[in-house]
Amino acid sequence: MDPALRSYHQRLRLYTPVAMGINLAASSQPLDPEGPIAVTPRPPIRPSSGKAPHPEAPRRSPNWATAGEVDVGDELIAISDERGPPRHDRPPLATSTAPSPHPRPPGYTAVVSPMALQAVDAPSLFVAWLAARWLRGASGLGAVLCGIAWYVTSIARGA
């Protein structure tokens, strides 16, 4: 460990309340399960595009979350009410017909090939196979081979 980082950790440990003899549990208030739910106020959620809300949407939804009990479902309903009905000028999940600025090589398919991860997966599968053999009680040699394979494949695993 870096000496400066070690020094920082030692000072951090030295000045923690527990190290100074302060019992935080004794000084804290007991939790009241019947107490009110604390909700912090926040600004209203705006569309991420920065555009104004839909003109047909109501200005303030009756489902908008208040400072009382907050329910995620109510917030989602309020957001959808403020956004208004969906646009009908294009179908959902429509893609543009413009050509891609990055042409694909011939024979390219959109399906991801499992070959992309094979270089990393093959050593890991071998290590897993050795570990399974060792756990089944084949012999102590399996444990040794598992350790060697783990060390040899450390670069491929990014360790």
From Swiss-Prot:
The UniProt record lists the keyword Phosphoprotein: yes
Cellular location(s): Host nucleus, Host nucleolus
PTM statement from Swiss-Prot or TrEMBL: Phosphorylated.
A GO cellular component entry from the record: host cell nucleolus
Stretches the record annotates as Disordered: 27-107
Keywords: Host nucleus, Phosphoprotein
Keyword Transcription annotated: no
Biased composition (Basic and acidic residues): 80-91
Family that this chain belongs to: Belongs to the HHV-1 US8.5 protein family.
Protein name, as recorded: Protein US8.5
Lineage: Viruses, Duplodnaviria, Heunggongvirae, Peploviricota, Herviviricetes
